[in-house]
Amino acid sequence: SYKEGAEAVRWECDGSPEYSLEPTSKESRGTEIVLHINEESAEFLDTVRVESILNKFCRFLPVPIKYEDKQINNPTPAWTKKPSELTTEDYQNFYKELYPYNEPPLFWIHLNVDYPFNLTGILYFPKIKQSYEIQKDKIQLYCNQVFVTDEVKDIVPEFLMLLQGVIDSPDIPLNVSRSYLQGDPNVKKINNHITKKVADKLDEIFTKDRPEFEKKWD
């Protein structure tokens, strides 16, 4: 323990609702976890399967995560930084980190709100082809950099589901019904805020350089 003289503790559970806690001895600081896998869960001993799970759920955790001596996460992703600290290249590199096989995006918006709700994130507007099919799992929802879901249709307006990227908010209710989400005041505010930010960005591009704006839709 970080507290000098504190006693080490051993926690043990066989998978049932009950567990045991007992004093033990330990020289080094920190926690060691030994997980026993039964035959039915043998897939979780496969390196590719483990890396896939870690990449999905631990990709942007705010503390370094190592797997077999290799750090597998980015604890300081672009959306946690101020827009003034990022360059165009930074935004494009983060897009590649999220979608390594996609073409560069048309533009992006950086969300950074702390009142009346907390919301950070980066949303990208992808290149759209005539045969483009909207995929509704391209926006990832996080809560303090912990992955929650990629089902955000009740948080992001339906007509903006072509957007891609990340939103992070501790003010969005977790593990609740769709009807509850639709009635939550913070979700409504976040929904409206995202809509306005996209509209403002489109208006900005149109006003500053109409030929370039029109070229984006060719």
Regions found by a protein language model. Name each.
Residues L174-D209:
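Extended, well-ordered alpha-helical scaffold/bundle regions in very large, multi-domain proteins
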Residues L35-H36, L141-T149, V176-G183:
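Glycine- and acidic
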Residues E39-E40, P77-P83, H110-L111, R178-N186:
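Conserved short loop/turn motifs at secondary-structure junctions
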Residues V48, V63, E68-I167:
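GHKL/Histidine-kinase-like ATPase module
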Residues S1-P75, C143-V146:
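GHKL-type ATPase core
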Residues K215-D218:
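A contiguous, basic/glycine-rich beta-loop/short-helix subdomain that forms a polymer-engagement track
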Residues H36, K56-P64, Y101, L162, ...:
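Conserved, well-folded catalytic cores of nucleic-acid-processing
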